[in-house]
């Protein structure tokens, strides 16, 4: 609503827009922007406040936005935090017109005294209209704070509170980060930290709640009436750790040795919850006593937390640690993204959208919860999470159990000892054996490097890929029919034990249990005390022939295996059928290496024969090109050539139709002139894909002719 405020100059008035008409009796000024030339002439003048007859000044302050409303705002220092600051700058009177329970008091005027604030709003607007002060009412979208428990509108009001002076505490905490003694990871968060700390305000630490740490301030009793209690701030007080110490200080302060505990009354307010939280790095270790834990664990190395509490918690722990312990509480502050709900909203009590970790643990397991969160939480951005996301961790736990069971079965069937690490004989190793060891070496190096850089998500993904893909998908399958089972089992035990240790920070329960069941650990031992894997020594790598060349060769061989399996699927060859294949290598030396892999390839291909040739001549069968050459699948006796020829012809016709459709668009001048460049480039890229597909389809058409 807009309120016309009659001025003192004849019948002049100024127009004020407000969303809080009920606070009008508490107004002590109206304000304009200093650069707003429309109102330069009235700055410093007085106006009469409607319905009260009280004169209030017109002031200028940068807080006022010229373009907002009428460009003039009413200032109520006792009932708005921004108005309070304006009032401080201009030394305005603070008139509190409400009681603690949201009713108007006597300062609001006799007519409104006792009314509920919302009832008063309606009454004031009606009276303004009746007196001719109301110009008009219009709808306005406003951000109104509500209590998350009772959903009542929160009312800002003036009250006496306890504050901590923060600037002297902030200065050494700023210096600790600027000097490099403490660093943020990623570093960009240090700018946010500096911005808050360099513009820090005194901290209001008192809260009017029933629960919490009670403020250790004690008043010397005087008038015990309600009116006397309301004047607590005028009574002498002391601050002390205990009531007994408070009594000693009260006696010293007043000079009255006859004071007793009955003469002291502790302040009823409690401390802001962050006031106890900022002591966390040392209060949990026995402080203020000088304990062994405090001496050993303070300061710690790393703090890992989310960006939304850098100021509320991180900065305050820095200040408290330096003030009380004379050194920062941690060396590295690792900031990760916020874990949000499935809709991207921050989890909060008011929204009721927080996930219950106990429910997740009950349904998926504690390890699944830990690993899944590590896998989706990054340093770079926020992440969305719902219950289904924890299936990843649960499925991974199952994979670990199944792999462990396979090892137990193999040990029992072949008489292998899981408890003792068998020596690895370099002369007995195949290329797949060496590849597994190199993959383990690379995984250990990668995980150590990523954890050293606090890339916890990337390290989790690296361990996941190493265990699931390299160990389970490939090497376990190889080990089932390995030509040298003893060598394969020795390697499998070695890499499995390393994988469990790499996984332990993420999944401590399943890795600990499996390590004991497999005999890697004795009774009373724990992975926590085991060495974190670093890879292999130079001597071991030399003795076992572990090179990047071996690794790359087996990776290319696996690419060929995947291609052959894709061909089988494409032509719907029965998984049980044995096929005939040909590998055409790029060079003769590659062909020689591949001949040594024939038995392994026959098992992987499920082939009755694998012919190795070299050269460039195209063979009359479907094939897929890879790094080592082209793998071909003979379809003789496996597919209905007539049916396949018909299928290929239909697909060829459909693909050619798609190309014609794209050509029609690209030849349309209107489309080219108005379509976004990205759309046009996308159409061209799609056309190139279809052209390549046609080449393959034409080859197949010849094959089935």
What are these regions (language model features)?
Residues 1-101, 172-206, 210, 227, ...:
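NTP-handling and nucleic-acid-processing catalytic cores
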Residues 518-705:
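C-terminal low-complexity, glycine/proline- and small-hydrophobic-enriched intrinsically disordered tails
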Residues 146-150, 339-343, 347-429, 520-523, ...:
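Catalytic adenosine-cofactor/nucleotide-binding cores of aminoacyl-tRNA synthetases and other
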Residues 17, 62, 90-102, 209-211, ...:
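Alpha-helical recognition segments enriched in aromatics with Gly/Pro capping
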Residues 219, 238-239, 341, 374, ...:
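Acidic, turn-prone loop/beta-hairpin segments
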Residues 38, 50, 88-95, 126-136, ...:
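Secondary-structure transition/capping motifs at alpha-helix termini
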Residues 1-7, 24, 68-224, 263, ...:
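Residue patterns forming the tRNA-binding/recognition surfaces of aminoacyl-tRNA synthetases
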Residues 197, 397, 440, 444, ...:
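Short amphipathic alpha-helical coiled-coil/interface segments
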């Amino acid at each position: 609503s807009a309120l016309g405020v009659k001025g003192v100059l004849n019948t002049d008035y100024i127009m004020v827009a407000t969303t809080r008409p009920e606070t009008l009796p508490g107004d002590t000024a109206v304000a304009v922007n200093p650069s707003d030339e429309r109102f330069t002439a009235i700055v410093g003048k007085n106006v009469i406040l409607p319905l009260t007859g009280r004169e209030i000044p017109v002031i200028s302050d940068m807080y006022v936005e010229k373009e907002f409303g009428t460009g003039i705002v009413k200032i109520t220092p006792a009932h708005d935090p921004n108005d309070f600051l304006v009032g401080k700058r201009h030394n305005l009177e603070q008139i509190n017109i409400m009681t603690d329970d949201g009713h108007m008091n006597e300062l609001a005027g006799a007519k409104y005294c006792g009314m509920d604030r919302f009832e008063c709003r309606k009454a004031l607007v009606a009276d303004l209209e009746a007196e001719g002060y109301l110009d008009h009412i219009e709808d306005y979208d406003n951000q109104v704070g509500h209590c998350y428990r009772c959903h009542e509108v929160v009312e800002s009001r003036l009250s006496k509170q306890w504050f901590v002076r923060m600037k002297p505490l902030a200065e050494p905490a700023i210096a600790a980060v600027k000097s490099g003694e403490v660093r943020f990871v990623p570093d960009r968060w240090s700018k946010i930290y500096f911005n808050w700390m360099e513009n820090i305000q005194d901290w209001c630490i008192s809260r009017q709640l029933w629960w919490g740490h009670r403020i250790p301030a004690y008043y010397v009793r005087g008038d015990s009436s309600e009116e006397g209690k309301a004047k607590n701030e005028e009574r002498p007080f002391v601050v002390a750790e205990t009531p007994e110490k408070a009594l000693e200080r009260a006696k010293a302060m007043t000079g009255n040795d006859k004071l007793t505990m009955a003469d002291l009354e502790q302040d009823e307010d409690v401390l802001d919850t962050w006031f106890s939280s900022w002591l966390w790095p040392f209060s949990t270790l026995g402080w203020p006593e000088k304990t062994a834990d405090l001496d050993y664990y303070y300061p710690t190395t790393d703090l890992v937390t989310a960006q939304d509490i850098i100021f509320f918690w991180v900065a305050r722990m820095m200040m408290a640690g330096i003030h009380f312990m004379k050194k920062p509480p941690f060396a590295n502050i690792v900031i990760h993204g916020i874990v949000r709900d499935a809709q991207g909203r921050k989890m909060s009590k008011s929204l009721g959208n927080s996930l219950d970790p106990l429910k997740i643990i009950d349904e998926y397991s504690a390890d699944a919860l830990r690993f899944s969160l590590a896998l989706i939480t990054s340093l770079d951005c926020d992440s969305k999470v719902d219950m289904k996301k924890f299936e990843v961790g649960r499925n991974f736990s199952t994979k670990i159990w199944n792999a462990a069971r396979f090892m137990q079965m193999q040990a029992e069937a072949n008489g292998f000892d899981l408890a003792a690490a068998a020596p690895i004989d370099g002369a007995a190793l195949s290329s797949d054996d060496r590849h597994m060891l190199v993959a383990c070496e690379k995984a250990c190096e990668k995980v150590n490097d990523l954890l050293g850089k606090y890339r916890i998500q990337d390290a989790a993904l690296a361990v996941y890929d190493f265990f699931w893909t390299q160990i389970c998908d490939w090497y376990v399958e190889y080990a089932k029919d390995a030509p040298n089972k003893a060598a394969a089992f020795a390697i499998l035990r070695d890499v499995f034990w390393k994988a469990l240790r790499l996984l332990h920070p993420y999944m401590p329960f399943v890795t600990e249990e499996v390590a004991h069941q497999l005999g890697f650990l004795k009774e009373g031992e724990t992975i926590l005390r085991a060495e974190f894997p670093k890879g292999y020594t130079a001597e071991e790598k030399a003795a076992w022939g572990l090179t990047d060349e071996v690794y790359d060769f087996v990776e290319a061989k696996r690419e060929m295996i995947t291609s052959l399996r894709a061909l089988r699927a494409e032509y719907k060859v029965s998984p049980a059928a044995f096929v005939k294949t040909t590998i055409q290598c790029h060079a003769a030396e590659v062909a020689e290496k591949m001949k040594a892999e024939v038995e392994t390839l026959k098992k992987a291909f499920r082939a009755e024969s694998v012919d190795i040739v070299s050269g460039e001549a195209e063979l009359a069968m479907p094939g897929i090109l890879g790094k080592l050459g082209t793998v071909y699948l003979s379809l003789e006796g496996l597919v209905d050539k007539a049916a396949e020829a018909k299928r290929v012809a239909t697909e060829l016709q459909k693909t050619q139709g798609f190309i014609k459709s794209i050509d029609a668009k690209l030849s349309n001048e209107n489309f080219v002139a108005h379509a976004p460049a990205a759309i046009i480039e996308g159409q061209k890229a799609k056309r190139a894909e279809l052209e390549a597909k046609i080449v393959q389809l034409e080859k197949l058409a010849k094959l089935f002719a």
